[in-house]
């Protein structure tokens, strides 16, 4: 991998990690279109550490508040004593499903599921499901039903969204896409669904990144060029990712996810067309 490729892939990761359009899909598609080698699942997981740092910085106050409440609750023998402490434990519990399924299907995730056929199918399928969630929002608005805010999230919502997050193990589905969609089905506001999605991403993305970094450590140490490129891609992903978070939170306050639904369907169909015409290999 060249430095130029690392920068482009870092930008792709940062732009698409938080938008509901799948960063993994773009890290698979961009190299295929450019004629580069697939960077692999390990590269994807490690570069996500950059976007993890973006979440830590953007939601720094929320994270400090929640973490402090969890620690204080444990010290006072009242782990669920405050809403912030409860939020921390709900995030932890919501992370369990993706960890379990990730370990069970690790081989498939890193190999067969990275096929562009799977990616295009996931892009289109989630777009259809997300459009259904948007339709439900309109129905609720017509009935005068108010959407839920962060303070309204309960164990039911957290656990269901956490379970739904497991679908993100399929490349092309989008971790933020499936969790935001799950939140919308649970009547969270679009902004709240995005905020909870980003906070829920922290444990899973951190664990996946550290695991893949550990697995790849020897090969990275053996190649200074690969290590430098990975660091550059991670830094670029973090910077672009921060801007992407700010954009999406602001965007969803005023707009629906329609533009992302259209983009996902168009991209999925384009990939299938490129495969059919022999322009890219699945």
From Swiss-Prot:
The chain crosses the membrane at residues 40-60, 85-105, 117-137, 158-178, 193-213, 231-251, 258-278. Belongs to the UppP family. Its EC number is 3.6.1.27. InterPro entries: UppP. It catalyses: di-trans,octa-cis-undecaprenyl diphosphate + H2O = di-trans,octa-cis-undecaprenyl phosphate + phosphate + H(+). It is found in: Cell inner membrane. It is a multi-pass membrane protein. One of its GO terms (molecular function) is undecaprenyl-diphosphatase activity. One of its GO terms (cellular component) is plasma membrane. It comes from Prosthecochloris aestuarii (strain DSM 271 / SK 413). This is Undecaprenyl-diphosphatase. Keywords: Antibiotic resistance, Cell inner membrane, Cell membrane, Cell shape, Cell wall biogenesis/degradation, Hydrolase, Membrane, Peptidoglycan synthesis, Transmembrane, Transmembrane helix. PANTHER family: UNDECAPRENYL-DIPHOSPHATASE. Catalyzes the dephosphorylation of undecaprenyl diphosphate (UPP). Confers resistance to bacitracin. GO terms for biological process: cell wall organization; peptidoglycan biosynthetic process; regulation of cell shape; response to antibiotic. The gene is uppP. Bacitracin is thought to be involved in the inhibition of peptidoglycan synthesis by sequestering undecaprenyl diphosphate, thereby reducing the pool of lipid carrier available. Pfam families: BacA.
């Amino acid at each position: 991998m060249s430095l130029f490729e690392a920068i482009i892939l870092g930008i792709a990761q940062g732009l698409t990690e938080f938008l509901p359009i799948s960063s993994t899909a773009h890290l698979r598609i961009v190299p295929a279109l450019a004629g580069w080698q697939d960077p692999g699942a390990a590269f994807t997981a490690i570069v996500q550490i950059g976007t993890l740092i973006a979440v830590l910085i953007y939601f720094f106050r929320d994270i400090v508040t929640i973490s402090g409440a969890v620690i204080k609750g444990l010290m006072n023998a009242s782990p669920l004593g405050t809403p912030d402490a409860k939020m921390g434990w709900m995030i932890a519990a919501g992370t369990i499903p993706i960890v379990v399924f990730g370990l069970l299907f690790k081989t498939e995730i890193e190999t067969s599921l990275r096929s562009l056929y799977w990616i295009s199918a996931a892009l289109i399928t989630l777009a259809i499901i997300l459009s259904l969630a948007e339709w439900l929002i309109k129905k609720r608005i017509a009935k005068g039903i108010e959407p839920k805010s962060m303070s309204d999230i309960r164990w039911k919502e957290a656990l269901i969204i956490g379970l739904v997050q497991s679908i993100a193990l399929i490349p092309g589905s989008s971790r933020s896409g499936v969790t935001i969609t799950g939140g919308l089905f649970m009547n969270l506001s679009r902004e709240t669904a995005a905020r909870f999605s980003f906070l829920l991403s922290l444990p899973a993305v951190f664990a996946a990144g550290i695991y893949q970094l550990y697995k790849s450590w020897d090969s990275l140490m053996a190649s200074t060029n690969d290590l430098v490129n990975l660091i550059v891609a991670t830094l670029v992903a973090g910077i672009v990712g921060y801007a992407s978070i700010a954009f999406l939170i602001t965007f969803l306050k005023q707009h629906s996810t329609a533009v992302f639904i259209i983009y996902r369907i168009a991209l999925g169909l384009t990939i299938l067309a490129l495969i059919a015409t022999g322009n890219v290999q699945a």
